[in-house]
Curated annotation (Swiss-Prot):
Gene3D superfamilies assigned to the protein according to its UniProt record, in alphabetical order: 6.20.10.20, Adenovirus pIV-related, attachment domain, reovirus attachment protein sigma1, domain 1
Domains as described in the record: The tail region anchors the fiber to penton base capsomers, whereas the shaft, built from several repeated motifs, allows the knob to protrude from the virion.
Induction (UniProt): Expressed in the late phase of the viral replicative cycle.
Domain of life: Viruses
Organism: Human adenovirus A serotype 31 (HAdV-31)
Described function: Forms spikes that protrude from each vertex of the icosahedral capsid. Interacts with host receptor CXCAR to provide virion initial attachment to target cell. Fiber proteins are shed during virus entry, when virus is still at the cell surface.
Name of the protein: Fiber protein
Subcellular location: Virion; Host nucleus
Length: 556
């Protein structure tokens, strides 16, 4: 006898004409290519895959080497008889482990009732809404989950939780626990009566306190008054003194009012003189010394060279002869040195020497036996010029610059030394020190802004240790090549030369020097720009750089 055929999910439910003897479907034999195995039950059996009878199981049952077995977790194992057992589990009190299994240890007031742990209670404790509570009656109360004691306005809880009476002073309870009245002078308690001690000027009149008075005090009605006469008065319920000119009340004293020029000396008012004044026989006079004169009026004794200038409201001025080489520069007398033959060097007036001249051993001008020719291949400021640059203030730096032409290359040496202001003492705002030298289309130095060299600075062809008196007419051969360094081009890397140097020649004070060729955008000629950065790291020190070299391609 054959079992009925298991219906597959892909077959319609109405396919109930299966023939177990002839199992092949006449309409589609591909669905059942063989005869299925004997009967299956939905309880733990299944036909999977089709035509194969297998068990239907779930975790913890698994198969291992073709046999059924169980997955075992922690604390579970099989003994040698194939029995499922548990291992001893570590427990802590109150859960002891016995041969009967885990139990619970307890003690009173805990107990087990109806297999449940419960709490035994006695009045005034009770269990309400599955919570332990306390049954109370007045004056005991429960407020905000705390047990309290109701009290009235005259009672209070003292320290230690004792109930007592709230007694304001002067009521007290001494050690006898009797309510008494505390009294202090002038009150007394005699023979269970409250009394009052009095002394003059207080007295008793008809059982009432009264005040005995004598002039200038008197009583009007129930008020004590003070009789006053000028200059005394009563102001704002206080006795005061009325004052006139020269007097005032200061603090609690009547004092004299004094103005400027007066002072107290041992309680006596005296004139306070200072700044060229003194007192003589009760009079204030001027105490002067030369060059002042105070015989009649205060005047100034003048010597030669000083005059009163009527055009300046009779101010005292210096009388100089501007026709003899003197002039005013600001508020200072200066030498008016003309452009020819004279110059200033290290703040000294000096004669300019041209070609063929020199100073003799006794500092006289003499002719050179052999005139020193000038060098047309070198332009410079002389090797040690005086202050010749204005960067932050007038003549605050000394620039030493030498340009030497070598075929198509110009080699340069530069050094800058600060002599005053922010360059003598570097400030936090002095982050970069820089200067421009601007040249016209012929390579001649432009002595106006933005050129840093002042107009009177030495600049020209090298001749001996000075500059040639011959003017620089064409110096294109010393100029930066505009094809190599187009203008303006301050941001072009090719137009810059960078080198590291050291402030004051100290290798522990590194700074960076940058030379820019034709970088000034305000000119159509040529320019050299020198910048030193990183100087703000050395505050209050003198800005001074070593001699640094640089090179560039010449225009010609």
């Amino acid at each position: 006898m054959k079992r009925s055929r298991t219906q597959y999910a892909e077959e319609p439910e109405e396919n109930d004409d299966f023939n177990p003897v002839y199992p092949f479907d006449p309409y589609d034999t591909a669905h059942v290519p063989f005869v299925t195995p004997p009967f299956t039950s939905s309880n733990a059996f299944q036909e999977k895959p089709p035509g194969v009878l297998s068990l239907n199981y779930k975790d913890p049952i698994v198969t291992e080497n073709g046999s059924l077995t169980l997955k075992l977790g922690n604390g579970i194992k099989l003994n040698s008889q194939g029995q499922l057992t548990t291992t001893n589990t570590k427990v802590l009190e109150p859960l002891p482990h016995t041969s009967q299994g885990l139990t619970l240890s307890w003690s009173a007031p805990l107990s087990v009732k109806a297999s449940a742990l419960t709490l035994n209670t006695m009045a005034p404790f009770t269990t309400t809404n599955e919570s332990l509570s306390l049954v109370t009656a007045p004056p005991i109360t429960v407020e905000a989950s705390q047990l309290g004691l109701a009290s009235c306005s005259t009672s209070k809880l003292r320290g230690g939780g004792n109930l007592g009476f709230h007694l304001p002073a002067p009521f007290v309870v001494p050690s006898s626990n009797a309510l008494t009245l505390s009294a202090s002078d002038p009150l007394t308690v005699n023979s269970n009566s409250l009394g009052l001690n009095i002394t003059s000027p207080i007295t008793l009149i008809n059982g009432s306190l009264a005040l005995a008075t004598s002039p200038p005090l008197d009583t009007t009605g129930s008020t004590l008054n003070l009789s006053v006469a000028a200059p005394l008065s009563v102001s704002q319920n206080a006795l005061t003194v009325s004052t006139g000119n020269g007097l005032q009340v200061s603090g609690s004293q009547l004092v004299t009012r004094i103005g400027d020029g007066l002072r107290f000396d041992n309680g006596v008012i005296k004139a306070h003189v200072a700044g060229g004044n003194e007192t003589l026989r009760g009079k204030i006079i001027l105490d002067v010394n030369y060059p002042f004169d105070a015989t009649t009026n205060l005047s100034l004794r003048r010597g030669s060279g000083l005059i009163y200038n009527e055009s300046t409201n009779w101010n005292l001025t210096t009388d100089i002869s501007t026709e003899k080489g003197l002039t005013f520069s600001g508020n200072q007398i200066a030498i008016n040195a003309g452009p020819c033959g004279l110059t200033f060097n290290n703040r000294k007036l000096q004669v300019k020497l041209g070609a063929g001249h020199t100073f003799s051993s006794n500092d006289n001008i003499a002719l050179n036996s052999i005139a020193t020719p000038y060098d047309p291949l070198t332009l410079w400021t002389t090797p040690d010029p005086p202050p010749n640059c204005t960067l932050r203030q007038e003549l605050d730096a000394k620039l030493t610059l030498c340009l030497t032409k070598n075929e198509s290359i110009v080699n340069g040496i530069v050094s800058l030394i600060g002599v005053k202001g922010d360059l003598l003492h570097i400030q936090p705002t002095t982050t970069t020190v820089g200067l421009h030298l601007v040249f016209d289309r012929q390579g001649r130095l432009v002595t106006t802004t933005p050129t840093a060299l002042v107009p009177q600075a030495s600049w020209g062809y090298k001749q001996g240790q000075s500059v040639s008196s011959s003017a620089v007419a064409n110096a294109l051969g010393f100029m930066p090549n505009v094809s190599a360094y187009p203008r303006p081009n301050a941001g072009e890397a090719k137009s810059q030369m960078l080198s590291q140097t050291y402030l004051q020649g100290d290798t522990t004070k590194p700074i960076t020097m940058k030379v820019v060729f034709n970088g000034n955008a305000t000119v159509d000629g040529y320019s050299l720009t020198f910048m030193w950065t990183g100087v703000s790291n050395y505050l209050n020190q003198q800005f001074s750089t070593p001699s640094c070299s640089f090179s560039y391609i010449a225009q010609e």
